[in-house]
């Protein structure tokens, strides 16, 4: 999927996260800010990267501000932000 505009998904509430997505040419940059980065940073990065790979995102800037969200919430917020930022092409729901 190609990211063509900026988008947001989520909140700053406890047990949630805010995902910001923006277009970027040629590279994929993922920035993760979390209150629990020392304990769960590797797992958060893994879930975000796996979700982006499943969606076919190869370039863009992804900023994740985590407040202790579970994996399923991370996945859902990343999916929502990316889908809002795409060019409206047909979504392949079976990949999600």
Swiss-Prot record:
Coiled coil location: none
Subcellular location: Cytoplasm
Keyword Thylakoid belongs to the record: no
Name of this chain's protein: Citrate lyase acyl carrier protein
Modified residues (O-(phosphoribosyl dephospho-coenzyme A)serine): 14
NCBIfam families: citD, PRK13253.1
Major localization listed first in the record, in broad terms: cytoplasm
Pfam family, one: ACP
Function description: Covalent carrier of the coenzyme of citrate lyase.
Gene: citD
Organism the protein comes from: Pectobacterium atrosepticum (strain SCRI 1043 / ATCC BAA-672) (Erwinia carotovora subsp. atroseptica)
Top-rank taxon, per record: Bacteria
Family, per entry: Belongs to the CitD family.
Species lineage: Bacteria, Pseudomonadati, Pseudomonadota, Gammaproteobacteria, Enterobacterales
GO CC entries: cytoplasm
Keyword terms: Cytoplasm, Phosphoprotein
Database matches in InterPro entries: CitD, Mal_deCO2ase/Cit_lyase_ACP
Keyword presence, Phosphoprotein: yes
Quaternary organization: Oligomer with a subunit composition of (alpha,beta,gamma)6.
């Amino acid at each position: 999927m190609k990211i063509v505009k900026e988008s947001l998904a989520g909140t700053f509430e406890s047990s949630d996260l805010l995902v910001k997505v923006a277009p970027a040419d040629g590279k994929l940059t993922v920035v993760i800010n979390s209150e629990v980065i020392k304990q769960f940073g590797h797992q958060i990065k893994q879930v975000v990267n796996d979700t982006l790979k499943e969606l076919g995102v190869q370039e863009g800037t992804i900023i994740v501000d985590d407040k202790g969200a579970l994996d399923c919430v991370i996945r859902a917020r990343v999916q929502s932000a990316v889908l809002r930022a795409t060019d409206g092409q047909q979504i392949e729901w079976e990949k999600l």
